[in-house]
């Protein structure tokens, strides 16, 4: 009863067993014995004996142990079972102390005073746990019945019965733990949900004897029950730690249509231990009949059931709460049932650590079901025997009544058109006439052709074959002297799509919402003894004289193509990354841009110029948005970061190429930075790590062969290192016409995360960030002249982890920099610095003014003197300029630093700050502040960036007349309020989408702005 010991196969609690146990286990044994023994003693001696067993006897036994036990490395396991709270505990201990050490501890310290007190507290806490109760609400909480005054005074419950024979009109029925058949260990099993015991239904069935015995004064017997709640209790026999998951369908078998029959779907783990409790509120009136228990059924199945076939997986029992419904009375639901539970429809009781899912089927009639339904009435009376003569009679058929109500959608428009052509006047035409003719007092069609029935307002995406969906064809000249970096064509995508007249050309121009992606198929045939690398890139917008470098244009949607390896190139893309639809007018007004450039020139010069043909289609594949939540990176994180073009000359010399993985700060040299949207997102974080997926493309003739080894290492390794391939590496060898290879380096190859941005002047020795190495494994050789050239692009980062926000570093390294991470705190990035004119003439006017474009990164000043302005290339500043679409909260901080030489008592400067959507005077201010604090002040406020494209906004776009956010300053006495710094921060919900092609950003340096050059470009 108290305990059982498992010790070397012996299950007896002997003196030898006790003295071979550790002291802690002895205390547990005596504590268990004392606790159990205490409840059998009288109250007045219970605590005296309990104290004796708990405090005195263990101390005595511990002192005696040193003479009897032989300590060694013994492993014992104790299992204790308590009948009061059904609680198993396990104690494992390795005894490895010497006898002298153990006895010395006991002799000096004794038994800790609070050990037994803590165990007693834990015991009482477990004893206080309540049992697993039924979760079905009480039936009198679901229904309201009439209760006489005496019952109200005595606080009596409503009339609740548990026997069908006593169930009369107005009474409530409550069934507890009605047994149900067990669930077998199979893929599918059907369990009937009884509403009451089957023997009660049979015993209460109507008979002649019972009809004769019913008293006239008795209440009428109930003919039906309103089922308010059913609780299905499933006790699984499976292990409590198994992964069996079951799905259950609650089915109303009186419906034959599955859309009406399936009431609810429940998914829950079929683990043992605690029961599965499914509570549903059917809100169904069930007729009392012998087959009433077969109406509701529970269909169960398991996806990964490993229980032995033929064995029961679980037992099932049911609780029900119903109200009797008869000819003279009905039920009255309480607000709890009608307004609360019936809206929930059902639930699964979730215990701690157990997940469950519930779905309910609702198949209510729609308006079209009422208008288009056909109703037919065909009623015949019974035949009757009529007397014809005194010697003859015959059966006469009864009268017949037939009437049809035909719905509006019962006849197709094709049938109606055919009837009109044939000149047949049908009765059904009357319901189609839409205008009243005063002459004939009837409804007439407006025209001979029923335009109201024609689908002229079809807004669906064009559909059909590839020929039906072809919208345009473009021809791209590829001269025989083309070299790397040549721009073959750079134009708006709308201009590409409006070339030619094909079947879908008109659909493209006249459809408001096109949900299919744009598919381009480029073809050209060139011989295999030459090769060329072309890039087709799509970007959401373009500003100014944007750079067409492959690093800048390939970040959104780009395909690298070597026609010598692949004769045809196919690419599908979504031109609206914020949503799932687009239109031609949208492409025109947002400036969606297409670039086709040559990345690597001809391996061998062809004899004539070449022409590439590009066919444009509307794809049947639907558009999928791709947005970036800046502070919560998606998985996978689409980057499309160009790592570089690697050239390996023919021969046996070992060439080593390094590509830095600190890729967040853009690419460039000391005086300029190339930046795109995904890299700007990465630059928001301080450190990052993840699984890196690279795409390696062959950019020369397939006849040039080489095996290249790729591995990760630090950048300070010398080129003549002899054991490069001691690192984990991947060998790449292209097939005959193979064009691309995908490489993946997991984060297991990186010890920690690394910085996203490194100063340009940092040496390789002091870098400390990993590099991607590419090295010739054997040799590069061919029968034709030319180098072996490959292009490397970092396409996605999987399982990315980012740490800390990045304030930013001025400048960029020559092939890129590195990503950073997230934090809840706001880290401010400096965007702009403005110094009022030093040569300001206060005799002409007492104020000056300037404006900062917060989203576009521009500064506008007046002509009151020589201004000093500075636009910083901070991470947020870069992000706002290269992200085409933006949505979310942007934090703005303005810091004014005044002339410190002015005394506080002499301060006489006032600054007014205006927040507007445009610099035009016709726009009202969104907010206005007035600051007059001497020497310095701060202003912090949020801006909610939101726009028309699924909440995203594009900077100063003609589409939907989008503008920007401008912060204008009116400075009175600018010789005192001199320097203004504008800083930006983003919130957790800030999202971006699409890339804007931008010119290279110059490394910021203080520029003296004259009055003639009054506006700063982005």
Curated annotation (Swiss-Prot):
Signal peptide span: none
Annotated Gene Ontology cellular component terms: host cell plasmodesma; T=3 icosahedral viral capsid
GO biological-process terms attached to the record: symbiont-mediated suppression of host innate immune response; transport of virus in host, cell to cell
UniProt site positions, description: Interaction with the viral RNA: 463
InterPro entries in the cross-refs: Como_LCP, RNA2_polyprotein, Viral_coat
Marked site (Cleavage) residue numbers: 446-447, 819-820, 1005-1006
SUPFAM superfamilies in the cross-refs: Positive stranded ssRNA viruses (SSF88633)
Entry coiled-coil feature ranges: none
Key words, A-Z: Capsid protein, DNA-binding, GTP-binding, Host cell junction, Host-virus interaction, Inhibition of host innate immune response by virus, Nucleotide-binding, RNA-binding, Suppressor of RNA silencing, T=3 icosahedral capsid protein, Transport, Viral immunoevasion, Viral movement protein, Virion
Residue ranges, annotated region (Involved in tubule formation by the movement protein): 401-407
MF terms (GO), sorted A to Z: DNA binding; GTP binding; RNA binding; structural molecule activity
Protein name: RNA2 polyprotein
Source organism of the structure: Bean-pod mottle virus (strain Kentucky G7)
């Amino acid at each position: 009863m108290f305990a059982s010991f498992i010790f070397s196969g012996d299950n007896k609690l002997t003196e030898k067993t006790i003295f071979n146990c550790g002291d802690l286990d002895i205390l547990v044994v005596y504590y268990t014995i004392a606790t159990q023994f205490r409840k059998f003693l009288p109250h007045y001696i219970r605590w005296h004996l309990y104290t004796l067993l708990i405090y005195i006897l263990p101390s005595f036994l511990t002192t005696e142990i040193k003479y009897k036990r032989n300590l060694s490395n013994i492993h014992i396991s104790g299992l204790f079972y308590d009948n009061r709270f059904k609680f198993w505990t396990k104690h494992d201990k390795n005894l490895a102390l010497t006898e002298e050490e153990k006895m010395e501890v006991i002799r000096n310290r004794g038994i800790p005073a609070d050990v037994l007190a803590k165990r007693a507290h834990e015991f009482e806490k477990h004893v206080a746990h309540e049992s697993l109760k039924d979760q079905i609400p009480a039936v009198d909480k679901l229904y309201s019945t009439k209760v006489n005054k005496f019952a109200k005074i005595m606080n009596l419950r409503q009339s609740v019965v548990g026997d069908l024979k006593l169930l009369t009109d107005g009474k409530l029925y409550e069934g507890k733990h009605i047994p149900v058949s067990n669930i077998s260990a199979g893929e599918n099993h059907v369990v009937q949900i009884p509403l009451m015991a089957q023997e009660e239904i049979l015993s209460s069935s109507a008979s002649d004897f019972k009809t004769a015995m019913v008293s006239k004064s008795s209440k009428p017997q109930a003919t039906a029950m309103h089922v308010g709640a059913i609780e299905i209790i499933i006790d699984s026999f499976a292990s409590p730690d198994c992964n069996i998951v079951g799905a259950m369908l609650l089915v109303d078998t009186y419906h034959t249509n599955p859309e009406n029959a399936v009431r609810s779907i429940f998914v829950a783990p079929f683990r043992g231990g605690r029961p599965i409790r499914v509570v549903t509120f059917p809100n169904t009136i069930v007729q009392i009949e012998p087959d009433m228990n077969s109406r509701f059924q529970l269909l169960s199945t398991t996806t990964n059931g490993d229980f032995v076939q033929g064995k029961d997986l679980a037992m099932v029992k049911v609780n029900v709460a119903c109200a009797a419904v008869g000819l003279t009375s009905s039920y009255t639901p309480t607000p709890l049932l009608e307004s609360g539970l019936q809206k929930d429809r059902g639930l699964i009781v979730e215990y701690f650590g157990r997940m469950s899912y519930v779905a309910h089927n609702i198949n209510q009639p729609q308006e079209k079901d009422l208008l288009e339904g056909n109703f037919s009435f065909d009623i015949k009376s019974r035949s009757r025997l009529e007397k014809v003569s005194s010697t003859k009679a015959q059966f006469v058929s009864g009268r017949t009544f037939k009437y049809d109500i035909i719905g509006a959608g019962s006849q197709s428009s094709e049938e109606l058109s055919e009837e009109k052509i044939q000149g047949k006047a049908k009765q059904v035409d009357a319901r189609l006439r839409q205008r009243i003719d005063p002459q004939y007092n009837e409804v007439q069609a407006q025209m001979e052709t029923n335009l109201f029935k024609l689908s002229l307002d079809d807004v669906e995406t064009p559909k059909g074959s590839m020929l039906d969906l072809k919208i345009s064809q473009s021809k791209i000249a590829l001269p025989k002297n083309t070299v790397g970096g040549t721009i073959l064509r750079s134009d708006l995508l709308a201009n590409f799509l409006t070339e030619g007249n094909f079947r879908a050309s008109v659909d493209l121009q006249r459809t408001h919402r096109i949900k299919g992606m744009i598919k381009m198929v480029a073809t050209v045939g060139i011989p295999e003894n030459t090769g060329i690398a072309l890039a087709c890139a799509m970007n959401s917008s373009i500003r100014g004289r944007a750079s067409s470098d492959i690093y800048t244009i390939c970040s959104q949607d780009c395909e690298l193509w070597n026609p010598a390896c692949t004769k045809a190139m196919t690419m599908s893309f979504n031109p609206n990354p914020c949503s799932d639809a687009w239109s031609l007018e949208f492409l025109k007004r947002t400036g969606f841009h297409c670039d086709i450039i040559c990345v690597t020139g001809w391996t061998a010069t062809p004899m004539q110029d070449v022409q590439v043909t590009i066919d444009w289609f509307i794809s049947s594949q639907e558009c999928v948005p791709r947005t970036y939540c800046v502070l919560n990176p998606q998985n996978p994180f689409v980057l499309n970061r160009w790592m570089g073009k690697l050239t390996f000359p023919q021969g046996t010399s070992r060439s080593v190429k390094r590509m830095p993985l600190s890729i967040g700060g853009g690419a460039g040299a000391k005086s300029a930075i190339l930046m795109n949207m995904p890299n700007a997102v990465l630059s928001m974080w301080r450190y990052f790590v993840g699984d890196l997926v690279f795409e390696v493309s062959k950019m020369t003739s397939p006849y040039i062969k080489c095996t290249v080894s790729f591995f990760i290492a630090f950048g300070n390794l010398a080129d003549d290192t002899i054991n490069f391939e001691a690192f984990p590496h991947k060998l790449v060898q292209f097939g005959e016409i193979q064009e691309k290879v995908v490489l993946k380096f997991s984060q297991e190859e990186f010890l920690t995360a690394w910085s996203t941005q490194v100063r340009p002047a940092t040496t390789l020795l002091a870098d400390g960030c990993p590099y991607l190495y590419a090295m010739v494994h054997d040799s590069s050789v061919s029968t034709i002249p030319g180098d072996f050239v490959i292009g490397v692009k970092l396409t996605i980062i999987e399982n990315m982890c980012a740490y800390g926000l990045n304030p930013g570093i001025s400048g960029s390294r020559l092939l890129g920099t590195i990503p950073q991470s997230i934090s809840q705190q706001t880290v401010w990035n400096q965007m702009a610095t403005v110094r009022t004119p030093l040569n300001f003439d206060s005799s002409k006017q007492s104020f000056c003014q300037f404006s900062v474009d917060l989203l576009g990164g521009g500064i506008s000043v007046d002509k009151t003197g020589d201004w000093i302005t500075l636009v910083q290339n901070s991470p947020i500043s870069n992000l706002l300029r290269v992200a085409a679409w933006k949505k979310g909260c942007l934090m703005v901080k303005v810091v004014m630093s005044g002339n410190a030489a002015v005394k506080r008592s002499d301060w006489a400067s006032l600054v007014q700050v205006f927040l507007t959507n445009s610099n035009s005077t016709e726009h009202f201010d969104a907010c206005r502040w007035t600051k007059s604090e001497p020497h310095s002040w701060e202003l912090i406020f949020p801006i909610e960036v939101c726009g028309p494209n699924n909440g995203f906004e594009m900077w100063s776009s003609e589409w939907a007349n989008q503008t920007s956010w401008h912060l204008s300053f009116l400075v009175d006495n600018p010789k005192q309020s001199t320097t203004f710094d504008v800083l930006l921060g983003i919130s957790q919900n800030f999202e971006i989408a699409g890339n804007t092609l931008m010119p290279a950003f110059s490394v910021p340096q203080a520029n003296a702005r004259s009055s003639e050059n009054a506006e700063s470009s982005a």
